Amino acid sequence: ATTEIYTLSLHDALPILGVTGAEKPAPARIFMHGQPTFKFAVKAVPYCIDQVLEKAVMAIEDVDFFVFHQANARIIDLAAKKYHIPPEKYYKNIQKYGNTSAASIPLVISELHDLGKVGPGSRVLVVGFGGGLTWGGALVEFA
């Protein structure tokens, strides 16, 4: 059962840049500005953790496991370091599969269940972020 959920999108608050018109053809490739995206995620993940914990009236110590979107191992490690989360309380599989996009959190939860690390009564805080500069989090308690 989900006990708390938090989502936010900055899409509407950001100016639209580089809009192409009839006289300027659209680029043929999609690309990402890696450094600004990394900086965004490094700020968004801790902010989301804080918001979920505040709304759930819980502390870091009350969470059994943390599951982060598997976009970048450094982002995961920085969030864990900021909150002093020990390695046994969070999991990375990006080194095995790469960035699996929207499937990353469910894949991690499935692996954790198979490994016996989460199960009935486990409280898991999940945080995801992605396209459109959006992020969200939830505190899930397994029944």
Where are the regions that the model predicts?
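Claisen-condensing/thiolase-fold acyl-transfer catalytic domains that form or cleave C-C bonds
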Residues: 42, 53, 64-143
